[in-house]
């Protein structure tokens, strides 16, 4: 029997349980879900300010920070890499409302690196529409595995959403990192269900 462990998380840091999910074969065809949104690809060079604004609009309630902590040079290199596709769901007037990033840098695999919608569109069927486009593009010729990860800071329905679309959990991790509110990336009142513990100065 493995003894339980308690890990102390320092003030100014945050801990989350990450669940990794995968599928190793394309899901069975389904009737396409309709949406008033349209999908467009942002090709290189991606406008960094516009990208960061969308990333923040989608991810702030869930404390997304991965792209926000990158400097311009690193972010540009990441988004403009030939192995990364940035797709954006927009309203008819072109206003960005959702983000889909497909990372093909792995050997015969695709990672759904980022997937999300602005909060006011969640729970209205647009996520299923966006996932349909994601899987259609991810399962290109030669791909043997598509994977994604989510965490307990994400939308509470994220894990079951991925499972409904054919992903199978295969690994669980604990991640500890600097709280993005402590550094000013987000206001202190963001994600009130996750208390901000400031380091003493």
Segments the model singles out, each with a brief description of its role:
Residues 122, 148-158, 175-181, 185:
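Conserved beta-strand-loop-alpha-helix junction that forms the acyl-donor binding cleft
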Residues 118-132, 141, 153-157:
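Conserved glycine-rich acetyl-CoA-binding loop
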Residues 2-7, 153-172, 179:
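Conserved active-site alpha-helix within GNAT-family acetyltransferase domains
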Residues 1-44:
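Acyl-donor-binding surface of acyltransferase catalytic domains
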Residues 138-150:
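Conserved GNAT acetyl-CoA-binding A-motif
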Residues 4-5, 9-16, 176-201:
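Acidic/histidine-enriched, glycine/proline-rich intrinsically disordered or flexible terminal extensions
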Residues 33-66, 188, 201:
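Short amphipathic alpha-helix that is part of the acyltransferase structural core
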Residues 66-73, 79-119:
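A conserved beta-strand-loop-helix scaffold within acyl/acetyltransferase catalytic domains
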């Amino acid at each position: 029997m493995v003894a339980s462990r308690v890990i102390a998380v320092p003030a100014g840091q945050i801990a989350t349980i990450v669940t990794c999910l995968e599928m190793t074969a394309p899901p069975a065809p389904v009737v396409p879900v309709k949406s008033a949104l349209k999908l467009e690809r942002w090709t290189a060079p991606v406008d960094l300010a516009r990208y960061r604004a969308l990333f923040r609009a989608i991810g702030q309630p869930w404390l997304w920070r991965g792209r926000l902590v990158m400097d311009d040079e690193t972010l540009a290199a990441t988004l403009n890499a030939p192995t990364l596709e940035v797709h954006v769901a927009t309203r008819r007037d072109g206003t960005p409302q959702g983000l889909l990033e497909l990372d093909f840098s792995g050997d015969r695999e695709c990672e759904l690196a980022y997937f999300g919608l602005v909060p006011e569109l969640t729970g209205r069927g647009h996520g299923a529409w966006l996932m349909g486009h994601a899987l259609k593009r991810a399962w290109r010729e030669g791909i043997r595995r598509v994977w994604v990860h989510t965490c307990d800071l994400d939308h509470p329905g994220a894990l079951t959403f991925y499972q409904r679309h054919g992903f199978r959990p295969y690994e669980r991790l604990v991640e500890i990192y600097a709280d993005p509110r402590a550094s000013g990336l987000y206001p202190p009142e963001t994600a009130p269900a996750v208390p901000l513990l400031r380091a003493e100065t």
